[in-house]
Amino acid sequence: MKPLASVTRLSAVAGTTILVDRVDFTIWPGQVTALVGASGSGKTTSALALLGEHGAGVNLTGRVEVDEQIVVDDNGPRAAASVRGRVVAYMPQHPGSALNPARRIGAGLRELAKLHRPGEEVVQEALRAAQLPGDRATLRRFPHQFSGGQRQRIALAQALTCGPKILVLDEPSTGLDSVTRLQLVSELEDLAQQGLGILLLSHDLELVRALAKQVVVLSAGRVTEAGGTEVLPAATEISPTVGTMRAAEPLLQAMNVSASLRTRGREPILHEVDLAVLPGGCVGVVGRSGSGKTTLARCLAGLHERHTGRITLAGKELPVLRKRSAEQVRRVQYVWQEVRGSFDERRRVDEQVARTAQRLRGLNREKAHAEAVATLARLGVSAMVAARPPSQLSGGELQRAALARALLAQPDVLVCDEITTALDDDGTALVVDLLHELKQDRGTALVWISHDLGLVAAVSDHVLVLDAGRVVEQGPPATVMTEPATELTRRLVRAARVGQEPPPVTSCADTRSEPRR
């Protein structure tokens, strides 16, 4: 059996910085090869070399052969247009970079099918494989009308529409709830059995253990381990961080909040949600992709203006963002999942992080920069890395920079929407430890939105479960996770660990029960 792709002594250098140093790996038909490592370890740079692609200012050397074509040699990349899509399809970590915001998803999928494999059945097949409905209503929606997890699956459908021999998946479980993640494992196993070669880039060690035949562990651009799944590092345990609340009165409160995409003529996407966060407390919000978690976060941040009900901060009404005072903006900060688009590609990351302290707290440039560098270092982003433009940072590094940017406002409330999805266990532990310190020392209140039920249980003192925009269950995390009262929560808990039998693919929206109080 011939390999579909072989990478030999691949190196990537940007100026004097070595991004990848003599990396070797092979992709075989019907097998999953995994590249594993911390943010910035060289996973994405190595994978993009299969397409002959690289970041600005990066020089590639070594040998990359794909489908018996030389894509990279010691003189750098060669013409690789013939392998893109037809042989190698790449699904990026951040689906926003793969989706045209001005095109309905159906039109985009049909265009790809026309280029590679004409036929409407190709589009429907790709949607089914990506766990998405193929009805007209779905195909006519724009990318911004889907949740982050749903956009991830749309990007996967785009890659599958091309009918490639090799599928490169960069953090494919990012933003997926536990049920959909388990279904993804089953579908990728089926694709591999059909002969597709899969290159999996992931810090999700459970996903890698469930799928990979070969594992390559990267650290600082070098291969440190290679072999079967036995070479994977042990997971870092996140210790529970729930502390003592400081007061009985909520700091942030949402009362009877409903939201819709349009002012009239559209079913609400959030239905009469109540939420209260105490100083130093943390409310976790969980649910399947598209359940309304991000819409709730955007309402709290003032970004989603089409909502009804009341949102208060320390008992005072909070208007929408454009009507908030600078002090209100400072006190409530929002960090969302897809952060790359929020950074200016022309400016250094540390300067953009520091700007928050200058604008919202009045610090001078020198003090703001020193605080930015110190906060970034606490989160595992070195001063050397932070001095680069955003395009030269990995997804995990940029995610931590976005958190640091919000923290420099010294907020009273921090709304965190999937802020650890691009991080490995060690990076997640750094984030959790710093936020726990802020809760204890400053009384910072957190709203923590995540698909990682174990992490939610570790950081939260109260959990809301959303389904189809409604709170279907709530209570202490120990109770909700161990004695779930609704079928949805039971399915989420059962699916939280990869390797169990997948539950039925039927909609959860019809399994509602009264919320636990």
Residue ranges, per PLM feature:
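Helix-to-loop junction immediately C-terminal to a conserved catalytic motif
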Residues: L51, A301
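Conserved ABC transporter NBD signature motif
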Residues: N59-V72, E225, G309-E317
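ABC ATPase NBD coupling module
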Residues: V71-A89, L115, Q193, E267, ...
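Conserved ABC ATPase signature
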Residues: F142-F146, Q150, P389-L393, E397
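Conserved catalytic motifs of ABC-family nucleotide-binding domains
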Residues: G163, Q410
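ABC ATPase "signature
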Residues: A226-G227, Q474-G475
